[in-house]
Curated annotation (Swiss-Prot):
Pfam families: TatC. It is found in: Cell membrane. PANTHER family: SEC-INDEPENDENT PROTEIN TRANSLOCASE PROTEIN TATC, SEC-INDEPENDENT PROTEIN TRANSLOCASE PROTEIN TATC, CHLOROPLASTIC-RELATED. It comes from Halalkalibacterium halodurans (strain ATCC BAA-125 / DSM 18197 / FERM 7344 / JCM 9153 / C-125). Signal peptide: none annotated. This is Sec-independent protein translocase protein TatC. Belongs to the TatC family. The chain crosses the membrane at residues 19-39, 70-90, 109-129, 154-174, 194-214. GO terms for biological process: intracellular protein transmembrane transport; protein transport by the Tat complex. GO terms for molecular function: proton motive force dependent protein transmembrane transporter activity. It comes from the Bacteria. Keywords: Cell membrane, Membrane, Protein transport, Translocation, Transmembrane, Transmembrane helix, Transport. One of its GO terms (cellular component) is TAT protein transport complex.
Length: 253
């Protein structure tokens, strides 16, 4: 087996090890999630968006499904920083020392952005959508009778994607640090990125202009913010590269 094959096998073994660590931590977090599920469900049932909505179990398994969904979602949120760290640990051997330190700092930023995306969707977007749907049902003279599983499924469909979408600035920072993307590239594909974000917003929201704008505008601003972040990161990378080249010339001289 040549050196290239050994290197490939080493990468595969390292990837398996990182995945195993994530699985172990997820199982531990899932146990914690089983304890968190009930108080979280009780709290969200008492929230303003749910107080006036009669919730019913239309299937025998609905309470169990809701409970397990909350347990797994709680586990994912708890283990999210671990996932980010294991991803960083997998790629960090290929980075310079200063790059490793810089990218390690992205993990808490990414986690807080994830929580920020969840908060934006839950406290701003979700109440508006519930109000819009309730108003539409009233205008159409439709009696609202929601299942608890349907309500919380809709809640997760709105909130969880925003937690992921709010990772865009961190992903852009990381890719810029690795030299994969540049601010110029992000600007050149802006119109295509905007189109993709419009499509994503269309999948998340109901077919109504105001709710669509409430999702689309933050996503477009997030992309523009990512370009600015990429610009700052790119400048730092260029400066470090110049310093590295100067040090190399001095050593050669």
């Amino acid at each position: 087996m040549n050196e290239r094959d050994m290197s490939l096998m080493d990468h595969i073994a390292e990837l398996r090890r990182r995945i195993l660590i994530i699985v172990v931590f997820f199982v531990i977090a899932l146990v914690v999630g089983f304890f968190l599920a009930t108080p979280m469900i009780t709290y969200l049932q008492g929230a303003p968006t749910a107080q006036d909505l009669p919730m019913n179990a239309f299937k025998l398994t609905d309470p169990l499904r809701v409970y397990m969904t909350f347990a797994f979602t709680s586990a994912f949120i708890l283990v999210f920083p671990i996932i980010l760290y294991q991803l960083w640990a997998f790629v960090s051997p290929g980075l310079h020392e200063n790059e490793r330190k810089a990218t390690l700092a992205y993990i808490p930023i990414a986690f807080f952005l994830f929580l920020g995306g969840l908060s934006f969707a839950y406290f701003i977007l979700f109440p508006f959508l519930i109000q819009f749907i309730g108003g539409l049902a009233e205008r159409l003279h439709i009696n609202e009778l929601y299942g608890i599983n349907e309500y919380f499924t809709f809640l997760f469909q709105i909130t969880m994607p925003f937690g992921v979408l709010f990772q865009l600035p961190v992903v852009v920072m990381f890719l810029t640090r690795l030299g994969i993307v540049t601010p110029e590239f992000l600007r050149s594909v802006r119109k295509y990125a905007f189109f993709v974000l419009l499509v994503v917003a269309g999948f998340i929201t109901p077919p109504e202009l105001i709710s669509h704008l409430m999702v689309t505008v933050p996503l477009l601003l997030l992309y523009e913010f990512s370009i600015w972040v990429s610009h700052l990161t790119y400048r730092k990378v260029q400066k470090l590269e110049k310093l590295r080249q100067e040090e190399y010339r001095q050593e050669e001289g």
